[in-house]
């Protein structure tokens, strides 16, 4: 491996990136102007000490040694008998007794919405499957929820808890949402997922929900549910404390799989998500703090992990960030982004630590994906990633996208600052990294250290970035010149 590129090789590596921006090999003088950075603090290695403190704080809840077998309340594991009432009664009895485990034994149990209560662990034994009804009426009445970053009243998530503490979903069993191209997924409005012209879809309701939020309509009056087409998420824990989701396998969700909202002290461990429908994100903590996601496998139809914090006007109204999150020892297969932040990030996202991750699929677009726009506002800062091995991704290994859905000009430019990536190895990618801010609002403070990108088709792109630090970064066998606080606004 060469110790440094020649000037010819160095320019060759950046030409493809510059061309992608329409800049040619060199940027015009106007692009060389930079603005003073808003942030002066730089990413530092000892930031990882905070990850250790988060891991020390986050502890899964403990449940009393009591068991309530759902079959004792009338549940039947034949796959066709509706066991909703039996499961509901078991949960209420467990809660009233002071807590414990609601046990689903081996068998296939059909159910509608499951609402968890404080001190209750829903435990699926090996061989147990909870199969969720395909009838939308099974998820009524509507509940207080958040749909793509906006608070409203909608169908219940399949498993839901509201303002509870000490709740669990554990065991070796399976949660099967039964969503497919005939149920739930067509509401996306895509022919890929079974929608046909003239069929109902979510588009009008999506627009209406955003307009209601912009107009300040009270959440209690933003009523959807029956007669509307906003798909519920699989698991949503809303304003909860002390949550554990462990061991289960999740299949075929209508939309996002695991969605804690405004919750604190959340552990997601040893979970397998295998769901390839529209917007089938794996785990999306939103406006949460003290979250640990570890030992999980994500094989999804959208982002594997996406950290969120509300959207646009409603995100500014609620104004609660996601922060103090650790992701470690996970496997990522298909999906749009491996570790993603946004696009619903208006309340802000900070102090996210991701380490010891494995990713590889021609259907995984990005390893690290930050997506936002000038409607969102908010911030993404203090993001730290290390020790990540990527076999291949379909697009950019590391993407900062200020142009997600729309570009500049809407008055709420986001702040992206203090990103530190170390020991990232990528075997194949369309582009090594794509870091592009706005001319008037730059990305601020990105450090890449000991990163190797091989078999890269189109180089890399950097524009409108203040304080880019490169140390031992290799692209297609060419070691890029080390930089210290270099203000890069063109492909380097």
Which ranges hold each PLM region?
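Extracellular/periplasmic carbohydrate-active domains that bind, remodel
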Residues: 2-492
């Amino acid at each position: 491996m060469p110790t440094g590129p020649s000037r010819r090789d160095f320019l060759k590596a950046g030409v493809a990136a510059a061309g992608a921006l329409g800049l040619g090999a060199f940027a015009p003088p106007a692009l060389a102007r930079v603005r003073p950075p808003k942030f002066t603090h730089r990413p530092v290695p000892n930031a990882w000490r905070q990850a250790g403190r988060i891991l020390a704080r986050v502890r899964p809840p403990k449940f009393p040694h009591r068991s309530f077998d759902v079959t004792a309340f009338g549940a039947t594991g034949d796959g066709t008998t509706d066991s909703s009432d039996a499961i509901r009664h078991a949960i209420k009895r467990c809660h009233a007794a002071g807590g414990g485990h609601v046990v689903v034994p081996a068998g296939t149990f059909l159910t509608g919405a499951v609402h968890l209560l404080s001190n209750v662990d829903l435990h699926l034994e090996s061989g147990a499957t909870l199969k969720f009804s395909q009838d939308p009426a099974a998820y009524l009445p509507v509940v207080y929820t958040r749909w793509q970053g906006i608070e409203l009243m909608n169908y219940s998530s399949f498993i839901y808890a509201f303002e509870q503490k000490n709740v669990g979903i554990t065991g070796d069993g399976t949660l099967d949402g039964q969503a497919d191209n005939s149920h739930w997924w067509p509401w996306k409005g895509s022919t890929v997922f079974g929608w046909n012209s003239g069929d109902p879809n979510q588009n009008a309701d999506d627009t209406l929900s955003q307009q209601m939020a912009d107009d300040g309509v009270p959440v209690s009056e933003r009523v959807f549910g029956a007669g509307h087409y906003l798909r519920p998420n699989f698991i949503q824990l809303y304003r909860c404390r002390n949550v554990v989701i462990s061991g289960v396998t999740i299949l075929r969700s209508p939309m996002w799989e695991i969605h804690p909202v405004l919750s604190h002290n959340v552990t997601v461990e040893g979970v397998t998500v295998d769901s390839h429908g529209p917007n089938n994100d794996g785990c999306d903590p939103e406006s949460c703090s003290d979250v640990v996601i570890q030992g999980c496998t994500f094989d999804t139809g959208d982002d594997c992990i996406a950290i969120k914090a509300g959207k646009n006007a409603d995100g500014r109204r609620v104004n609660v960030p996601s922060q103090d999150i650790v992701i470690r020892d996970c496997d990522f297969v298909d999906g749009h982004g491996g570790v993603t932040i946004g696009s619903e990030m208006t309340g802000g996202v900070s102090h996210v630590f991701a380490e010891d991750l494995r990713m590889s699929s021609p259907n995984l677009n990005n390893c690290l994906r930050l997506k936002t726009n000038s409607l969102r506002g908010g911030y993404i800062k203090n993001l730290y990633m290390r020790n990540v091995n990527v076999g291949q991704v379909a697009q950019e290994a590391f993407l900062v996208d200020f142009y997600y859905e729309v570009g500049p000009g809407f008055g709420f430019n986001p702040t992206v600052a203090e990103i530190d990536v170390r020991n990232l190895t990528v075997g194949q990618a369309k582009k090594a990294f794509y870091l592009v801010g706005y001319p008037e609002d730059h990305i601020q403070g990105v450090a890449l250290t000991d990163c190797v990108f091989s078999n890269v088709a189109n180089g890399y792109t950097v524009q409108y970035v203040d304080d880019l630090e490169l140390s031992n970064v290799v692209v297609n066998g060419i070691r890029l010149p080390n930089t210290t606080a270099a203000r890069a606004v063109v492909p380097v």
